[in-house]
Amino acid sequence: MGEAVDPKNDRYAVRYLLPVAVWMIVIFISSSIPQDDFPHLEFWGWAKLVHLIYYGVLCLLCQRALGAQTRFPVLARHSYLLGVLFAVVYGISDEYHQLSTPGRHGQMTDVLIDGFGALLCLGGLRAYRALRLRTAGDPSGE
């Protein structure tokens, strides 16, 4: 038979790992659309904003999953850095994948924007958490 499944681990997988996997699939599917079927967007327009959002969200989801797990404390301790690294590595693999998609091509600038989106979202998360901690210590909320 095998090892008994710990229900806590099942909840962790559904709550933290499933969103990461689903978001990665969303990115993969959207980057699999041939360029001819995609509306033309300006270089620094919506297409780059989509990269910022996609990889920023991926980074946040990865940080959340790594930070919540308790089995490997070193991963939780470095969850911010690892979230950024994961998003950038996935961005590189996505650009490579686009080389085989008709009408699409991989761009290093997109990888840089992916990394910037990841850093921007994590910076926002850290600022939000710091503000929340500061206001939690001050009952007046000031």
Task: Give the predicted meaning of each segment.
Residues 1-102, 108-109, 115-142:
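Bulky hydrophobic segments
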